[in-house]
Each structure stands twice: as structure tokens, then as C-alpha cells.
């Protein structure tokens, strides 16, 4: 099984797949991604792969520099965004905004349908 390059909490999966969440704010340990990178994405809780994203940009930011547009790209309010970041990274000062777009996703139902249809072609 191929390892995931980045993980997201399961609660963000639907927003990513719907295109509502288009950035992720991370600490320095994930600042190495570059524009153009295609990342394999999994859920944090079980590391289950669910999509690929393309990195559009990576830029530094502080909590004080976060704006309403950042919150919108995270699909939440600004106060909620700051609270979530403080909860995940309580001792950090500088963060990295990873802007991304959805490239492709794994849909188990679609995959099963395609296998059934393909199987019918050969029988």
C-alpha cells in the first residue's frame, strides 16, 4: 500500500471532496511542500486514502495575519479557525498556508460499479 503524503481530520474529508476546503494551515514540519506537488491524502484517524490534491502555493502566516478569506477557504468562521489551529498547534507562532486543489478522489461506490460493469463486458 502506498503511504499518504498528508492527512486531514476525518471531519474535513467531505469539505475537501466538495471543493469547500481549499487550504490547510500547518506547522513547520509540513512546510516543505512545493507548488505543483501532487499529494496523496488520507484521513488522520485511520490513514485511509481518499483523494489526491495539487499544491498551488505554500506561504508563511501568523494567527494575527489570518483573515476572513482564509477562514472561507477552510470552510469555517475566522474565530473558529483560530481556535482549531490553537488546539492543534498550541505552542506554534508561525504557520504555513498550503493552498491546494482537488485532483482526483477515491469513491468506493463508483469503483465497485466500474468493476461490475467491466466484469459484465467480459462474460
UniProtKB/Swiss-Prot annotation:
Question: Which species is listed as the source?
Answer: Haemophilus influenzae (strain ATCC 51907 / DSM 11121 / KW20 / Rd)
**Cellular compartments per GO CC:** cytosol
Question: Which Pfam families would you find in this protein's record?
Answer: ASCH
ASCH domain residues are 6-101
Its recorded name reads N(4)-acetylcytidine amidohydrolase
Where are the catalytic residues? 21, 24, 74
Role played: Catalyzes the hydrolysis of N(4)-acetylcytidine (ac4C).
Q: Which SMART domains match?
A: ASCH
